[in-house]
Amino acid sequence: MKKIFNFSAGPSMLPKQVLNQIQQELYDWNNLGISIMEISHRSLEFMELVHDTKRNLRNLLNIPNSYEILFCHGGARAQFSAIPMNFLRGSADNIDYINTGYWGYLAAIESKKYCHPNIINISSSKNELRYIKPMSEWNISKNSTYIHYCPNETVEGISIDDIPDCFEKKIVIADFSSTLLSRPVNVNNFGMIYAAAQKNMGISGLTVLIIRRSLINNISTVQKIPAILNYRILADSNSMFNTPVTVSWYIANLVFKWLQDQGGLDKIAEYNKKKSNLLYHAIDSNDFYYNNIHSLNRSRMNIPFFLKKEKLNSLFLSESTSFGLHGLKGHKVIGGMRASLYNAMTLEGVQKLVNFMNFFSKKYG
């Protein structure tokens, strides 16, 4: 079978070791004689899996006991609605939404159904390079109920790696869908972290929420929030208010164990840095390609790049696919190409992409 490398923004590659284990256990999970796809979510065996999954995630991120872990449906988009519904005290609340790019903006727009958010645009362009403005130019509200932001924008490939100083003593809610588990994160800096699983944690269908318990305790179970989106109800039911996506939970746990086997998030971060440095160097050292993000704000997970000869875009995509490189088409909003280097992408895969880019530029340059 031909070796394929999937650079899609999500669903992404899974580690080979995880795929092999899924294959081995597909018909007989945990020596029960039935598949994980068939087992009851109320069974003792599945409940053990739930506890193991939470424990492994808690260990990976050093999540303190003062935080609850929830496993939810609906992707990150469901949380765009759930967050204001759960945390707003009234429609007059001051809410800050940091507009870092495509996903940060969509979250802010969705919140308008429930409040009047202060949308803070923090990216700008100079000399054809997009960058994040200095924090002194961010118009943060003094008494905001919470601040929402997306630290890594998959579409534009722009990133805020460190938590901004201006967020200190604020309730910070962050969409970590494309970067959670790609590097260490100090959970204590956040009121809530949420992330869809299909990038660095497994397959689609699962969204992980890490929420400070004190925030959950302030939510009423009788508030006018759909029960399936009410964090208090989800916490009280151990994320099983309705039948969960059992397979997604199972695969997430396999990925958590794989990450531990790689040496944890410090080692993963080092490896991800090597991968992204390799690709950025290939782009910057070849006049055939370019990236439009300032070097200080470049994403390590999602790397857009453009051909200076745009008429060759379709040819690049077709030939790269034949080369075993899939999912390189850029997002429809910005075009060009995009290589997503999530945890399961190997250095071998990135090197193969670089080799193809060099080959293509020599052939058509």
UniProtKB/Swiss-Prot annotation:
The modification N6-(pyridoxal phosphate)lysine is found at K199. Its cofactor is pyridoxal 5'-phosphate. Its EC number is 2.6.1.52. One of its GO terms (biological process) is pyridoxine biosynthetic process. Pyridoxal 5'-phosphate binds at A76, R77, W103, T154, D175, Q198, N242, T243. Its main location: cytoplasm. GO terms for cellular component: cytoplasm. PROSITE patterns: AA_TRANSFER_CLASS_5. It is an enzyme of class 2 (transferase). Pathway: Amino-acid biosynthesis; L-serine biosynthesis; L-serine from 3-phospho-D-glycerate: step 2/3; Cofactor biosynthesis; pyridoxine 5'-phosphate biosynthesis; pyridoxine 5'-phosphate from D-erythrose 4-phosphate: step 3/5. One of its GO terms (molecular function) is O-phospho-L-serine:2-oxoglutarate aminotransferase activity. Pfam families: Aminotran_5 (PF00266). Keywords: Amino-acid biosynthesis, Aminotransferase, Cytoplasm, Pyridoxal phosphate, Pyridoxine biosynthesis, Serine biosynthesis, Transferase. It is found in: Cytoplasm. Binds 1 pyridoxal phosphate per subunit. It catalyses: O-phospho-L-serine + 2-oxoglutarate = 3-phosphooxypyruvate + L-glutamate; 4-(phosphooxy)-L-threonine + 2-oxoglutarate = (R)-3-hydroxy-2-oxo-4-phosphooxybutanoate + L-glutamate. L-glutamate binds at R42. Catalyzes the reversible conversion of 3-phosphohydroxypyruvate to phosphoserine and of 3-hydroxy-2-oxo-4-phosphonooxybutanoate to phosphohydroxythreonine. Belongs to the class-V pyridoxal-phosphate-dependent aminotransferase family. SerC subfamily. Homodimer. This is Phosphoserine aminotransferase. It comes from Blochmanniella floridana. The lineage of its organism: Bacteria, Pseudomonadati, Pseudomonadota, Gammaproteobacteria, Enterobacterales.
